[in-house]
Amino acid sequence: MPAPTSRLRAPEELGKNAAASAPQINQNEDDVLIDSSAPLPEITTTSQDADTDMHVDEEGRPLFTPITATDGAYRIENRKVPVPPHRMSPLKAAWPKIYPPLVEHLKLQVRMNIKSKAVELRTSKNTTDTGALQKGEDFIKAFTLGFDVDDAIALLRLDDLYIETFEIKDVKPLNGEHLGRAIGRIAGKDGKTKFAIENASRTRVVLADQKIHILGGFRNIRIAREAIVSLILGSPPGKVYGNLRTVASRMKERF
């Protein structure tokens, strides 16, 4: 842009100066600018897929189609549950009832290793539940502790079930005949006391020598444990029955 104080020039002179200042194009250069005979690069037009189309509802909120399931990469995990020697024979006898829930419900791969006396669990590409392996391990452990198969299967169906284990000596150090009497008070004649505790607290109890295993919910386990502890400390069964009736009536009112 010329300065405001510069001398005015004629239009012809301005045209000559502009032509002189323009860069000269060498006609002999071999630069290829655009060749009409050369094939043009293919231009692909992408259309939106039906799965990625965005739809809007009446309130203006976007609605997206669900993602289709794909076969992604998965990691194989293994668990090895040891089986005590005295539970190998019951395991072999109940094996037709043990493996179907693990294979059909949890989609796990299961095998019984007789040589190492263990049950081996492994995930597969069909396993969808992330906690399937842990549930399967808890199920096998419950059976090895002495619970019935039908009771142990509840661990696969319900998430709020636990197993609590304690010994009689943890409550009171007993030896000899005193220990035998304590176990007898817990079991009762023909298992009557144990069944009464199970029915009142809605749990399952296993007496394995000096160890006691309780399967059930958190509050139910506490009720059964208090009754068993009272029997170990020497409370008469009649008093324990009365307390169980009171607790059972309260549970019915609550639920």
Curated annotation (Swiss-Prot):
| Keyword RNA-binding appears in the UniProt entry | yes
Q: Name one GO cellular component term.
A: cytoplasm
Question: Domain named KH: which ranges?
Answer: 176-228
Subcellular locations according to the entry: Cytoplasm; Nucleus, Nucleolus
Q: Which InterPro entries match?
A: KH-I_PNO1_first, KH_dom, KH_dom_type_1_sf, KH_PNO1_2nd
The UniProt keywords, alphabetically, are: Cytoplasm, Nucleus, Ribosome biogenesis, RNA-binding
PANTHER family per record: RIBONUCLEASE Y, RNA-BINDING PROTEIN PNO1
- What does the record give as the function of this protein? Required for small ribosomal subunit (SSU) synthesis. Has a role in the processing of early nucleolar and late cytoplasmic pre-RNA species.
UniProt-recorded name of the protein: Pre-rRNA-processing protein PNO1
Name a GO molecular-function annotation. Answer: RNA binding
Protein's GO biological process: ribosome biogenesis
By sequence similarity, the record places it as follows: Belongs to the PNO1 family.
Which residues, by range, are in coiled-coil regions?
A: none
SUPFAM superfamilies xrefs: Eukaryotic type KH-domain (KH-domain type I)
Q: How does it assemble?
A: Component of the small ribosomal subunit, ribosomal RNA processing complex (SSU RRP complex).
Q: Write down the CDD domains for this protein, in alphabetical order.
A: KH-I_PNO1_rpt1, KH-I_PNO1_rpt2
Region (Disordered) residue spans: 1-31
